[in-house]
Amino acid sequence: MSRTIAGVLAVLLVVGGVAGVALSPAAGQAATHESTVNCSFPITVTDANGANVTVSERPERVVTLAPSASQVVWELGAQDSVVGMPVNQYTSYLNGSSEKTNVVTDNGQPQIETIIGLEPDLVLAPNIISSDAVEQLRDAGVTVYRFESASSIGDVVEKTRLTGRLLGTYETATDVSARTQAAVEAYRNATTGAERPTVYYAMGGGFTAGPQTFIGDVIDAAGADNVASAANISTYDTISTEVVVEENPDWIVVSGQSPIPSDPALSNTTAIQENQTVRVDANFISQPGPRVTQPLRTLATAFHPEAAADVTADPSTVSAPVCAADAMEPTTTESASATTTDSSAETTEMTTDSTTESTTAETVTLETNQTMDQATEQTTTATGPGFGIVAALIALVGAGTVTRRQ
């Protein structure tokens, strides 16, 4: 398989609240506004397919086609409007998700007839949903918004705001996105000037995420340099063991229950020698949404423990467009992805690859001066199974799992 094809497959496979940050006393204040947007129905926005999508009134029946979109809707408090969504281990951390109608196959593909039968007012389709599926729904008279892909945390912020406009929850969306953006900026600022360790993000099957990806941006915001750059990998692709060894990463990052690379060639790297391997939540690192701040905090705390310990985020410093009934419609395409945060901590079961992981969903509140629950951190030893033929097959199956996770 060529590197180009492999890269495309990897993108499809992987792309599928503010956590651990103390909010400053100004957190209860509104974010600084720099422009206005139309938040009154009807709303017309241009989607990733170039279609002008009009939502005539606040949707009462919403379908989400991927876990990331579901996460955002829950984050905005609009979960009661959801009538259909992916109902599986990748959305089980969302309260009440099991009561919704499942609209995807085991492979994460949309079930067109089921969706049409739900008579939705609006379908939210992340970019991993094919244009063909979107057009099938539109041909049946269904209103569908297909989002642009998220290649940075900034994209997540913009998608959250747009989702709020489409659902009639823009004020909540600006608050959620401001908290997300403030946390990210706080970690970036806290690690500015510090020595940046090198990091290898091991996705399994030899794949990694480059700097021009959502995951790569998380690594950068945590104050580290991605070894994928040395292999000229910008998005998702395979990276050779030789390059990893040559770059000698200070840290190796894995997600969920993915095995820690134990190739003998890596045994002399600093990461293995110093037992510097960190594990992040598989769903939150692969679902572009507000919960991205959880793996961000996990990584920043591992890479820069002293700097990350006292990080304080101030949402009041974040600029965001304010609603205006007479605002001109933006000429650029806007989009939104998905994220969610429950108002109470809960322990849920999430399947990663072929194993089950118990993960604690963090408490995210809107109270001033409150330190949010810390994301689950797990520093591991380098004694995972090697990548033999069987392990390679498992890795490929796991990659398919990540597609459904997004």
Briefly describe each language-model feature range.
Residues 47-50, 101-113, 150, 231-241:
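Short helix-initiation/N-cap motifs at beta->coil->alpha
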Residues 130-203, 228-230, 281-330:
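Extracytoplasmic substrate-binding proteins
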Residues 110-120, 139, 238-248:
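Short helices/loops that flank or line small-molecule/ion binding pockets
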